[in-house]
Amino acid sequence: MLKKLDSLLSAAGIELPDQQKHQLIGYVELLDKWNKAYNLTSVRDPMQMLVRHILDSIVVNPHLQGSRFIDVGTGPGLPGIPLAIVRPDAHFVLLDSLGKRVRFLRQVQHELGLSNIEPVQSRVEDFAAKPPFDGVISRAFASLQDMLSWCHHLPAKPEGRFYALKGVRPDDELATLPEGIVVESVVRLRVPELDGERHLVILKSN
């Protein structure tokens, strides 16, 4: 699996220290193991997990600004855990409402020794951001409007950002954003061996 990860990282132009590579592989191994009983992801093949979960998450890293983030609707820790592994200097709250997912996140935290993640079981509307976050990250929301509606209380004002991971560029959604929200950028992400487009939408309050 290390050989495959090295190949993907090289194709994406990403360099990581060996410790982070081994942590990423350890995460995939845990996800594969727990997935058999807990059905955490529809991706069954660990090699595909490297593409669709690991690379698809860490390509976001160069675009993150700040050091305190929340991954909303993180599921089994995506994109939060891969990002936390490659950003040991930053702190990530991993928020999900489902107990089995949060139990898995705590197991990953324990086994991989990740001191910079904080798994939390909560509905997003019930979670108090104290202090507010530099960035709110998610690939769980169906629409940008949903993300802004549910997560409006989480980022610091005015410098906090929303980072939405999307497939095709969501031009229809971008055209109907609520007042007071500006599009800082829409970045096309390059994920080796991933079919389909990936975009990162970065939004701010003005």
From Swiss-Prot:
Q: Which gene encodes it?
A: rsmG
Localization:
Cytoplasm
The keyword Transferase is annotated on this UniProt entry: yes
One example of the protein's molecular function in GO is: rRNA (guanine-N7-)-methyltransferase activity
Does the UniProt entry include the keyword Nucleotide-binding?
A: no
Describe the reaction catalysed, as an equation.
guanosine(527) in 16S rRNA + S-adenosyl-L-methionine = N(7)-methylguanosine(527) in 16S rRNA + S-adenosyl-L-homocysteine
What is the similarity comment for this entry? Belongs to the methyltransferase superfamily. RNA methyltransferase RsmG family.
Q: Output the Gene3D superfamilies linked to this UniProt entry.
A: Vaccinia Virus protein VP39
Q: Which GO terms describe its cellular component?
A: cytosol
Principal location: cytoplasm
**What Pfam family is a match, any one?**
GidB
Q: What does this protein do?
A: Specifically methylates the N7 position of guanine in position 527 of 16S rRNA.
What's the protein here called? Ribosomal RNA small subunit methyltransferase G
Q: What does the entry list as the binding residues for S-adenosyl-L-methionine?
A: 73, 78, 124-125, 139
UniProtKB keywords:
Cytoplasm, Methyltransferase, rRNA processing, S-adenosyl-L-methionine, Transferase
Q: Write down the NCBIfam families for this protein, in alphabetical order.
A: rsmG_gidB (TIGR00138)
Q: EC number(s) per UniProt? A: 2.1.1.170
In its UniProt entry, the species of origin is given as Yersinia enterocolitica serotype O:8 / biotype 1B (strain NCTC 13174 / 8081)
| InterPro entries registered for this protein in UniProt | rRNA_ssu_MeTfrase_G, SAM-dependent_MTases_sf
